[in-house]
């Protein structure tokens, strides 16, 4: 990646229309972040320490906990730093790093949810062959594939964004460095980067959405064939948690990246939901309501 820029740092403007609320936001977001760290560490510890939880479903839940820890830590610590009265400045390299890991982990999230939908599809539609199909090798390959796709995605968008010259304005209208906020600061035509970013994010989101839709269509057909009401309820409750998490994850992507001109305030609120609230809720949605995990927590 070549550096054409005279800009050595960017200024994160933070959340629009929140002047005077810094102390309240610092307390609120610090509480959310602490709950995110504690909840996901507890879930990860329970899954690793209990042999009863060494199953495909909990293997992917463990990956989700690792993702949530990393995803929230990409943007939240810097936000808490300047909300506490410190500088809003972020170095050029820090901005590059933040954007890379945000898209790396964000893409990984989409494909991880897709893999988890496929796992539920096999568990409900082929229960007798579940352990044979979702063996250790398959699970490892699927998990590794999600992280690799996320890495390639970020390695495409990050150089494309920062190969442009940044020679003047350096105020980022977000609370972290992301493509919609950074690209307008470039001193050169950004149409190519915008088209590639839109196509990349949109295509990957559609692929994941299509695979999830197919999986849950098959799951719905299988559930409708279950004769006992208790069996249908159990299968549905297993899938409802995953569907809830998918809605929380895909909503921000659709609003932020597939709208031509999202408002700064709306964008910030949705990004906070995606970056901070969803990782905090995932342990509750997926695991803390699960009796197996509850019984194995330290």
Curated annotation (Swiss-Prot):
Topology, Cytoplasmic side: 45-52, 119-137, 216-235, 289-298
Keyword Transmembrane helix part of the UniProt annotation: yes
Keywords assigned by UniProt, alphabetized: Cell membrane, Disulfide bond, G-protein coupled receptor, Glycoprotein, Membrane, Olfaction, Receptor, Sensory transduction, Transducer, Transmembrane, Transmembrane helix
Subcellular location: Cell membrane
Biological processes annotated in GO: detection of chemical stimulus involved in sensory perception of smell
Cellular component GO terms, alphabetical: plasma membrane
Glycosylation site list: 3
Topology of this chain in the membrane: Multi-pass membrane protein
Gene3D superfamilies noted in UniProt: Rhodopsin 7-helix transmembrane proteins
Primary location class: membrane
TM spans (from-to): 24-44, 53-73, 98-118, 138-158, 196-215, 236-256, 268-288
Primary role: Odorant receptor.
Protein name: Putative olfactory receptor 10D4
């Amino acid at each position: 990646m070549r550096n054409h820029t005279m800009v050595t740092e960017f200024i994160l403007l933070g959340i629009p229309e929140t002047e005077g609320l810094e102390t309240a936001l610092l307390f609120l977001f610090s509480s959310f972040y602490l709950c995110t760290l504690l909840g996901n560490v507890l879930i990860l510890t329970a899954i690793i320490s209990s042999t009863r939880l060494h199953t495909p479903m909990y293997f992917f839940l463990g990956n989700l906990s690792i993702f949530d820890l990393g995803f929230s830590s990409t943007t939240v610590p810097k936000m808490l730093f300047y909300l506490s009265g410190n500088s809003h400045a972020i170095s050029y390299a820090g901005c590059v790093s933040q954007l890379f890991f945000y898209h790396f982990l964000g893409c990984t999230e989409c494909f991880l949810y897709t893999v988890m939908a496929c796992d539920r599809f096999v568990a409900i539609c082929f229960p007798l062959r579940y352990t044979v199909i979702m063996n250790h090798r398959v699970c490892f390959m699927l998990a590794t594939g999600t992280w690799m796709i996320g890495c390639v995605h970020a390695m495409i968008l990050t150089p494309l964004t920062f190969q442009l010259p940044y020679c003047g304005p350096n105020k980022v209208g977000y609370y972290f460095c992301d493509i919609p906020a950074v690209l307008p600061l470039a001193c050169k035509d950004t149409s190519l980067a915008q088209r590639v970013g839109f196509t990349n994010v949109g295509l990957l989101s559609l692929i994941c959405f299509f695979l999830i839709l197919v999986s849950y269509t098959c799951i719905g057909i299988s559930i409708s064939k279950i004769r006992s009401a208790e069996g249908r309820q159990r299968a549905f409750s297993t899938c409802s948690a995953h569907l809830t998490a998918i809605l929380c994850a895909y909503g921000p992507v659709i609003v932020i990246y597939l709208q031509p001109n999202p408002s700064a305030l709306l964008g910030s609120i949705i990004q906070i939901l995606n970056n901070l609230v969803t990782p905090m809720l995932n342990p509750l949605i997926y695991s803390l309501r699960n009796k197996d995990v509850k019984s194995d927590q330290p």
